[in-house]
A protein has these predicted regions:
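Catalytic core of DAGKc-family lipid kinases
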Residues: 1-67
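Broad hydrophobic/π-residue packing in well-ordered secondary structure
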Residues: 3-5, 28, 64, 80, ...
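A generic structural signal for short beta-strands and their flanking turns/coil linkers
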Residues: 7-11, 30-32, 48-52, 67-69, ...
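ATP/nucleoside-binding phosphotransfer catalytic cores, i.e., glycine-rich phosphate-binding loops
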Residues: 18, 23, 36, 41, ...
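N-terminal start-of-chain detector that recognizes signal peptides
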Residues: 23-26, 43-44, 68-71, 90-96, ...
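Short low-complexity stretches enriched in small and charged residues
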Residues: 23-26, 52-54, 73-79, 103-107, ...
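Residue-level signal for pocket-adjacent positions within structured domains
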Residues: 29, 56, 77, 83-84, ...
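Gly/Ser/Thr-rich active-site loops/lids in small-molecule metabolic enzymes
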Residues: 59-107
Length: 179
């Protein structure tokens, strides 16, 4: 039939424990995103944020006070990252998108990074956090634990039918023709 094969970028996601010396305890792959977000514990009031220190290629960038921090692929730019007000990135593009979720700070913008960038997200303080990959919990996180995201060597291969039309997809998905 009339079909195409699209290759989509994926993320390699490593969870590194504070006491583990940088050795990954969990390795996963994400088509959409990896998220470090706050996790409520018994007896804890809601509404608190998690503090996440970010490194880019091993260099300190900033720390976020937010409900979470999303590292997304272009495919994931229309998933959770979109809900957090991140930009829509053409899914055939290669980039890593870093989007804060409900940040409590002046710098609240998404970064669109080169796919060769290593993004490190370290839980700061004692606030409980969790790492999810494509919506599935992969690890509870404590202070000093890190999640490291890089472009995966492997790609996702998706079969598509008919011509590729990003404009038409966006118009239909988000009701833009009604304007």
């Amino acid at each position: 039939g009339d079909h195409d094969l699209e290759e989509r970028m994926m993320l390699r996601v490593e969870v590194q424990r504070k006491a583990g010396g940088g050795v990954p305890e969990v390795v996963a792959h994400a088509l959409n995103e990896a998220v470090v977000e706050r996790r409520a514990t018994d007896g804890e009031a809601g509404g608190q944020t998690v503090r996440v220190g970010v490194t880019l290629d091993g260099e300190s960038f900033t720390s976020y006070a937010a409900d979470g921090l999303i590292a997304a692929t272009p495919t994931g730019s229309t998933a959770y990252a979109f809900s957090a007000r991140g930009p829509i990135v053409d899914p055939l593009h290669r980039a890593i998108q870093l989007t804060p979720v409900s940040p409590h700070m002046l710098f609240d913008r998404t970064l669109v990074l080169d796919p060769s960038t290593e993004v490190g997200m370290e839980v700061l303080g004692r606030r409980a956090a969790i790492c999810t990959v494509d919506g599935r919990p992969v690890a509870d996180l404590a202070g000093g634990d890190r999640v490291v995201c890089t472009a995966a060597e492997r790609v996702a291969r998706l079969v598509t039918f008919g011509p590729r039309d990003l404009r038409g997809l966006l118009v239909n998905r988000f009701g833009l023709a009604d304007r």
